[in-house]
Amino acid sequence: QLFAIVSMLMIIPSVVAFVENDYFVARTFLYSCFAGIIVYALIAIALSNITKVQNNFEKLISFILSYLFLPMLMAVPLFLSLDSVRFQDSWLQMVSAFTTTGFNLIDLNTSSTGSALQLWLLMGSWLGGLFFWICAISILLPLNISRFEIGAADLSDGTSVKRNEPINPIINCARQLIPIYIIITVGLWLLLTLAGVSGFKALLVAMSVISTSGFEPIKYEVGNLFLIEAIIFLFFVFALSKSLFSREINEFQKRKIYNDPEIRLAVIIVFSVTGLFCANSIFKSILENAPLDFVILFKNLWGIFFTVTSYLITM
């Protein structure tokens, strides 16, 4: 089903390219969309007689294989739209996006590439973040191989899986998490727009931040840099702990936020590392007999604080 969803989503960058009068890229995305839907339909027909329900291990294998084959589909319009790019480079670029790694092989920030390809790259990372979030709760959590089992000892039966597990936990999790994911993304998009970032660029930044992909689609305006970073930092908090989202999914998470072990650990790490770097800057100034400029010190402190937090949420 995700194969068909990714194929249909290609219509969005196709429309963007058409609006920009980039008809070649628009046709590339549109034809890739049709080809993906046809391939999905053929596979669905071939497997229609198979009624076996996957167990958790088989779901894990499917989850892993998704990171191999879905980026191949995502890479097709990227490869066809850029003459000087090999398919393996396009595939690795989309693997980087879908896994929210943020490793950039192809520079799409030039004026010659257009907005559609930039949007598709960020859509890939945004979908990858949502995909991993859903699968981490519905697949990795029952197998106890993710960090989501922190606090699971509070359950009465000593496990991290509910006994009344739904027939299809992936769909159940998706119904609960997709609206939250969309609302957070739209909220960040609107706030960045109010801060002075253009609508399209704000959307790219919002998808990059919420998916924790690390892609930097734009260069911020210097005058609004602190305000933009402050807004982004507010949304970093949502990535620090699962209990901020999934209270209904896991009963053991019904506790106060300040008692959450993940929040406490994040606060300790961020303030400790920031304090060490700040102390190092002050110590260097003392050794060099340089006067302390508190404005520069505050900027350095904020930069360290922001950077440490951004690294932490990608872990």
Give the location of each predicted region.
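Membrane-proximal intracellular helices of multi-pass ion channels
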Residues: 1-315
